[in-house]
Regions:
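Compact alpha-helical subdomains of small soluble proteins
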Residues: 45-111
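Immediate post-signal-peptide N-terminus of mature secreted/exported proteins
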Residues: 19-38
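Hydrophobic h-region of N-terminal signal peptides that target proteins for export
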Residues: 9-18
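Generic hydrophobic secondary-structure packing signal
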Residues: 14, 24-25, 44
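Sec-dependent signal peptide recognition
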Residues: 1-8
Length: 111
């Protein structure tokens, strides 16, 4: 039972954080989508949906294309282009680094 309370408090904390920072939620959403990690993508989208702001999160994912040094763009296309230019290993290293920098792991694990 204690575990359920800790998880619930963690989700509430993440939702409060998400409310304050849709750019981060959007970036995490895009990073997970680019890597094909749909379970974590759904977790991020679930938080946005629970807050009634899923569309804003999707828009933020596209606005957060600065991860690849671009103002706007499709995450999957950007990831593929980066992998073509620098190699798949480097692209994945950068994607994982960005996931860590944004604290995406906590959002993905919360649901």
């Amino acid at each position: 039972m204690t575990k359920h309370w800790i998880i619930a408090l963690g989700i509430l904390s993440l939702e409060a954080q998400a409310e304050a920072d849709f750019e981060t939620l959007g970036a995490c959403s895009g990073l997970y989508e680019a890597g094909g990690n749909m379970a974590r993508w759904r977790a991020v989208q679930g938080i946005a949906e629970a807050l009634g702001r899923q569309q804003e999160t999707i828009e933020a994912a596209y606005d957060a294309g600065w991860w690849f040094g671009m103002a706007r763009g499709d995450w999957k296309e950007l990831y593929t282009t980066f992998a073509d230019d620098y190699g798949k290993e480097q692209a994945e290293n950068w994607r994982q680094s960005a996931i860590s920098d944004h604290g995406c792991e906590m959002i993905g694990e919360a649901r």
